[in-house]
A protein has these predicted regions:
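Polytopic endomembrane small-metabolite transporters, centered on the Drug/Metabolite Transporter
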Residues: 1-350
């Protein structure tokens, strides 16, 4: 008898190692993207707040111009990403941009509506952070979860589960507690604070509604067409820069003619602009590599960091027990909204 030959397990082991390596890389990318999201969200809010309240000689930078520059930087970043997807070939890049943007004018025009709304939202965030401390802004801005959910139900016919509806109720209660007036201030300071807080709150609320509508509208466009998210962001940035420039000349034309487009710009201003430009790209990466629960964790961590830094560094915020209670409710609602209960498996029959 001839000895039987054993089949080698090397191909199987090699395939298993390759799969494990791929899973490890995916996990690393997931947590890397979430870490970047926490850093970007927290640092943008804090630096924007600091830049709008910092007392300096000369004119303050125009927030409307910062929005335009952020849109232009976003276009540049997305073009570089399309270039990477085109295997770093300029001819391929040129063909892709020509075919997907210039040759499809009606598809490109679809982005005009969400782009205009996003431009309004970005300007409102500067107004909000000029009148609210970073911690209060961060917590209140989570109302965009509510508006996004409602627009998803009405525009995309999305069905929400019991946990999601419950989370929206908890979210509204949490934001109400966060906005609860404090009795610790003097009457004069309290009156001034109430006025500016009302302006900031209105700016955040309008930004939440605009964010919810534009986000769902953009999602609908992405689902109905096959264009890449980077191409769509280039189209958004194109219209955003046009609408932004219109806003600059309509609302800040007089100051612009006196002191120029880049009046009041310094290193901190450029940090704010770059962070704002990268925001959409970071969100896209998180959507690709992470899930809603981890995104909720990142948002919660960002709120906590903003609260601590506002108290210890900016010193423009004194947390109360009511604020903490409201913040805990908002964080819990964020987790609950992303919670996806898995149905119990069928019992094994004997």
């Amino acid at each position: 008898m001839y000895p039987t030959r054993r089949m080698s397990n090397k191909p199987k082991n090699k395939s298993k190692r390759k799969e494990e390596k791929s899973q490890e890389m995916s996990t690393n990318l997931k947590y890397l993207s979430l870490s970047i999201l926490v850093f970007q969200t927290t640092s943008l809010v804090l630096t924007m707040r600091y830049s709008r309240t910092l007392k300096e000689e000369g004119p303050r930078y125009l927030s409307s111009t910062a929005v335009v520059i952020a849109e232009l930087l976003k276009i540049l970043a997305c073009v570089l990403l399309v270039y990477k997807d085109s295997k770093c070939n300029l001819r391929t890049l040129n063909r892709v941009l020509h075919d997907e943007i210039l040759n499809k004018p009606m598809e490109t025009l679809k982005l005009a509506i969400p782009s205009g709304i996003y431009t309004l939202q970005n300007n409102l965030l500067y107004v909000a952070l000029s009148n609210l401390d970073a911690a209060t802004y961060q917590v209140t801005y989570q109302l965009k979860i509510l508006t996004t959910a409602l627009f998803s139900v009405s525009m995309l016919s999305k069905k929400l589960g019991v946990y999601q509806w419950l989370s929206l109720v908890i979210l509204m209660a949490g934001v109400a507690f966060v906005q609860w007036p404090s009795d610790s201030q003097a009457p004069a300071a309290k009156e001034h604070s109430a006025g500016s807080q009302f302006v900031g709150l209105m700016a955040v609320l309008i930004a939440c509604f605009s964010s919810g509508f534009a986000g769902v509208y953009f999602e609908k466009i992405l689902k109905e067409t096959k264009q890449s998210v980077w191409i769509r962001n280039i189209q958004l940035g194109f219209f955003g820069s046009i609408f932004g420039l219109m806003g600059v000349y309509i609302y800040d034309g007089e100051q612009l003619s006196k002191n120029g487009f880049f009046q009041g710009y310094n290193k901190l201003t450029w940090v704010v602009v770059v962070l704002q430009a990268l925001g959409g790209l970071v969100i896209a990466a998180v959507i690709k590599y992470a899930d809603n629960i981890l995104k909720g964790f990142a948002t919660s961590l960002s709120i906590i960091l903003s609260t601590l830094i506002s108290y210890f560094w900016l010193q423009d915020f004194v947390p109360t027990s009511v604020f903490f209670f409201g913040a805990v409710l908002v964080i819990a609602a964020t987790f609950l909204y992303g919670y996806d209960p898995k149905p119990a498996g069928n019992p094994i029959k004997a």
